């Protein structure tokens, strides 16, 4: 079982939690607290599993994730989840989020995408008003449903954009997740081309449980601007150089990889994150599914600082790189870089 790392000083742990941060790889459904799961399951007449979120590998994790999705039945359910996700993020120093949501199963069950997005917007707006933490959305294609379903979903999403449906303006990009094994990313090229033509950003989960060749396909065929996970990229030195030269961001989730996929990453000490950074890759730090992995971004910064011996300045640089890798415009990036610089100046002196 994965254990939390708690050997860095308490003052540094507190400072890392307060440090202004952005998160680029977090799944909205993966922020659902166990109490919320039980509440929504009871409300919707669903027999809930024990709230421990127990699983042993990626396959087991996906089963848990899909069960979490199953308790989201109404616009109000999505709003509740989104609101709580903002509060959790803000309590860990997150000032800006780019959050995945994966609606394919709900749409297959008859829920309208417009209602899902509007519900998420309701919750995010309330959370933003309360905390100041802002969120944009990434429409997440579920590979399990296949390329044709992805095209259909893009058609629906783009129609909502044309009609300026509530909340759809928050959707700034598309991504793709679920099982990576034996799935050719190139088969989703049509959906990605539709998104690109509409001006949406593109990313994809690759290189968590797939080889570096799949990362190359995501970049060259799908036109991805970022890669989520991407931890196998170092297996291909030529591709690594391309990513370094183009400063293609990789949204890495070290502790989540250890917790969810221990067969590939049995311990943080064996995770390639530090080697990715040393190679010059724009590797950012994220939680993936914080409630389901008993994480927070503040804790993840602590875990990484401890595991790899990173001092305060190294962690500040990681936070800054997250801003650089975001899909914010230049003015907003400048503003958040300023928040990080101000926190560095204030906190570094206290740590000295």
Predicted features along the sequence, with ranges:
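Metal-cofactor-binding active-site regions of metalloenzymes
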Residues: 2-200, 209-214, 221-226, 232-249, ...
């Amino acid at each position: 079982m994965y254990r939390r790392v708690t050997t860095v000083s308490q003052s540094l742990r507190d400072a890392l939690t307060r440090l202004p941060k952005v998160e680029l790889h977090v799944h909205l459904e993966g922020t659902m607290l166990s109490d919320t799961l039980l509440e929504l399951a009871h409300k919707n007449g669903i027999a809930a599993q024990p709230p421990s979120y127990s699983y042993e590998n990626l396959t087991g994790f996906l089963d848990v994730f899909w069960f979490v999705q199953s308790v989201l039945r109404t616009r109000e359910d999505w709003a509740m989840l989104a609101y709580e996700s903002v509060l959790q993020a803000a309590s860990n120093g997150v000032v800006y989020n780019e959050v995945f949501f994966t609606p394919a199963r709900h749409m297959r069950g008859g829920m309208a995408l417009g209602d899902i997005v509007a519900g998420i917007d309701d919750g995010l707006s309330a959370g933003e008003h309360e905390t100041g933490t802002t969120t944009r959305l990434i429409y997440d294609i579920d590979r399990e449903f296949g390329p044709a379903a992805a095209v259909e979903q893009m058609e629906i999403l783009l129609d909502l954009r044309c009609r300026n449906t509530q909340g759809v303006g928050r959707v700034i990009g598309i991504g793709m997740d679920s099982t990576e094994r034996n799935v050719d990313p190139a088969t989703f090229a049509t959906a990605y081309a539709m998104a690109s033509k509409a001006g949406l950003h593109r990313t994809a989960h690759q290189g968590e449980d797939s080889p570096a060749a799949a990362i190359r396909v995501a970049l060259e065929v799908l036109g991805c601007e970022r890669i989520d996970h991407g931890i196998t990229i170092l297996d291909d030195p030529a591709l690594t150089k391309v990513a370094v030269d183009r400063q293609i961001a990789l949204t890495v989730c070290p502790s989540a990889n250890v917790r969810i996929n221990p067969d590939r990453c049995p311990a943080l000490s064996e995770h390639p994150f530090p080697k990715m950074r040393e190679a010059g890759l724009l590797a950012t730090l994220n939680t993936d599914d914080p409630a389901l992995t008993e994480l927070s971004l503040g804790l993840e910064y602590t875990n990484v600082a401890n595991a790899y011996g990173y001092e305060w300045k190294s962690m500040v640089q990681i936070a800054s790189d997250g801003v650089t890798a975001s899909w914010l415009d230049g003015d907003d990036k400048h503003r958040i870089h300023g928040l990080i610089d101000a926190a560095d100046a204030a906190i570094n002196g206290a740590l000295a």
